[in-house]
Amino acid sequence: MLRLAVATNAETYERMQAPLADRGIETDAIETAERSIHVAAAAGGDSSQNGAGQFGEAFDVGFVFPPRLAEGGVADALLDVPWVNDRECILRSRGKGETLAWLSRAGLPTPETVVVSNPVDESVLKDVFAGFEPPVVVKPNSTTRGVGVALAEDLDSFLGICDYLDLVHDYRATGDQSFLVQEFLPDARDFRVMLIDGKVVGAVERRLPEAALAAGQWKHNVHRGAEATGVDLDEELGEEARAVTEAAAEVLDIPWLGVDLLVTDDRVVVNETNARPTIDEATKYESGFWDDLASLIRAQV
């Protein structure tokens, strides 16, 4: 039986264990963060406490490079296995600005976006804001789950948000000192499309409850209270959405990918991508999803 190292013990790991076991793949969660890892030890030591032995029995393949890149690099070196979505895939998707730059270069539709690399003069920020019709979305380049994303209705609010980002970026250990300024699409519907090897295998629409909308919420992240409902992508949006998402996966060359679409009456745009997407309930995927995922895992060996 193939041994799969899974760098998470959350929903994805819980949901994949039984379906993959039925397909000859044994999964085991590995902890790569918030622990100590011996990277070098004296000869003749306990092998279970050194090298790859610290992660349990030997593995054949890993499922998605670990979320913390530094510790993930240590685990990668010690485990010496191929990954479904390696380090380069994670980096290509994690940097929102880079993702949108590659997609835009390929002619795919994306929101109007400016990447700001701190520090910059206030005059630069004023020029950036002047290029948009307010309000504008301000988001850190590398965060997930809607963390740090804000809406600026006017110039003073925009500059105030940028001031807070300056405080964060002033800390010398901050690796990514960039952020995005984007157009706001207030009435857009929000979809997450899942792809395996460039093929759509499922989609959900993320909606906020009426109470949340009434309270002024606008972010559609599930971790922020949105509800995800499985949809048939072609029935909901037609062939254009499928074509756009599959083209995005091809451009980014990421085999296991979530693509976030914003859809208005006249536009379908790729807003973000996620190379570490959570596996949802099986009912939200097309038939054959688990077979496709098992095939992708085996293809890495």
Residue ranges and their predicted role:
Residues 1-5:
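Extreme N-terminal starter segment of soluble prokaryotic enzymes
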Residues 7-117:
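Conserved N-proximal alpha/beta basic substrate-recognition cap immediately N-terminal to
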Residues 80, 92-180, 184:
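Active-site nucleotide/adenylate-binding loops and adjacent lid/helix of ATP-dependent enzymes
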Residues 136, 202, 257, 269-272:
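Protein kinase-like catalytic core scaffold
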Residues 153-244, 248:
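Phosphate-binding site of ATP-dependent enzymes
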Residues 236, 250, 254, 263-301:
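C-terminal active-site "lid" helix and adjoining low-complexity regulatory extension at the edge
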Residues 259-261:
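Hydrophobic residue at the +6 position relative to the catalytic HRD Asp in the kinase catalytic loop
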